[in-house]
């Protein structure tokens, strides 16, 4: 496994230096919405987009940027770099684009999953997330429009051109996770809610529990009641309480590699080096030869 993208994360052995913030505010978007290179990606169910969206936005779903799922295959696996690039170019995204991703209602983790996909495509320094999504946008009087009234809906988008170097190394694979279960400086972190981590509820997965030695940090503890990312000070305390130390490389996972991207970006905002185990519990729980822990008891 290669190191994560140099230059986008900064960390030291005893303290953290904050990285550039991926979040933008509604006030920022009000000021910049008319810029030529701005691309808005709306994450939500199609009916919500049809009813209202920020003018000029393009509807997108995390599955649009994932391998089409065959029966029995893992859920929501990131597209190979060339296919991911071509898909994003089809949205009109190019090297000069500034992409702002937002959710329509409360889809925080699907939105961070889309943002992660852009980062893996090499566009991390040109990607932002609208903090609080469309509810926050509407709260400041931001304009919304129905698809039937949006003139941009009838305009065929010109494909973009992306030459940025992709970064598939931001995805940790199964072998990397197995090799680093007890490695110093590597924190395997489970972003699912507690009942799934403890193994009291298997959900839809073959086995219940968590990866041995993993830290528990439910993704929903990182966002406020109105679906904004918590402050850096609050997030620092949450990570410390979960047993994560400054300088650790965080490998986040969840059910299918979506909720874990909330943790991924929360950690990056603090300057941690972060990776996503894309296979997540969907993959680990299928491998009956791999150990699991339930309530700290290895099985």
Name these PLM-found stretches:
Residues 1-4:
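Positively charged n-region of N-terminal signal peptides that target proteins for export
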Residues 12-14:
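N-terminal signal peptide c-region/cleavage motif recognized by signal peptidases
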Residues 20-22, 27-95, 178-242, 246:
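Positively charged, proline/Ser/Thr-rich regional signature most characteristic
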Residues 43-44, 60-63, 102-105, 123, ...:
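Active-site-proximal beta-strand/loop segments in catalytic clefts of secreted hydrolases
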Residues 68, 134-212, 291-299:
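Active-site neighborhoods of enzymes that stabilize oxyanions during catalysis
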Residues 78-172, 200, 259-275, 279-282:
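Thiolate-centered catalytic microenvironments shared by cysteine-dependent enzyme domains
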Residues 235-237, 242, 247-298:
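C-terminal soluble interaction/assembly domains
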């Amino acid at each position: 496994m290669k190191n994560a993208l140099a230059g986008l994360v900064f960390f030291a052995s005893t303290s953290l230096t904050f990285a550039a913030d991926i979040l933008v505010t509604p006030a920022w978007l009000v000021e910049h919405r008319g810029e030529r290179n701005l691309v808005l990606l709306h994450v939500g169910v199609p009916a919500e987009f049809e009813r209202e969206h920020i003018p000029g936005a393009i509807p997108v779903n995390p599955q649009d940027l994932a391998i089409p799922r065959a029966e029995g295959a893992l859920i929501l696996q990131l597209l190979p770099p060339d296919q991911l690039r071509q898909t994003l170019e089809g949205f009109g995204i190019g090297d000069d684009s500034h992409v702002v991703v937002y959710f329509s209602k409360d889809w925080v983790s699907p939105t961070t999953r889309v943002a992660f996909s852009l980062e893996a495509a090499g566009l991390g320094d040109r990607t932002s997330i609208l903090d609080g999504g469309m509810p926050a946008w509407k709260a400041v009087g931001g304009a919304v429009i129905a698809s039937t009234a949006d003139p941009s809906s009838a305009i065929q988008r010109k494909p973009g051109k992306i030459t940025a170097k992709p970064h598939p190394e931001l995805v940790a694979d199964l072998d990397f996770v197995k090799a680093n279960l007890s490695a110093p400086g590597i924190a395997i972190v489970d972003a699912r809610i507690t009942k799934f981590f403890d193994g009291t509820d298997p959900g839809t997965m073959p086995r219940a529990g968590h990866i041995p030695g993993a830290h528990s940090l439910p993704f929903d503890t990182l966002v406020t009641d109105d679906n904004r990312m918590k402050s850096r000070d609050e997030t620092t305390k949450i990570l410390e309480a979960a047993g994560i130390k400054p300088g650790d490389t965080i490998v986040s996972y969840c059910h299918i590699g979506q909720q874990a991207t909330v943790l991924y970006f929360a950690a990056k905002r603090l300057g941690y080096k972060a990776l996503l185990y894309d296979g997540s519990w969907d993959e680990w729980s299928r491998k009956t030869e791999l150990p699991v822990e339930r309530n700290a008891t290895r099985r």
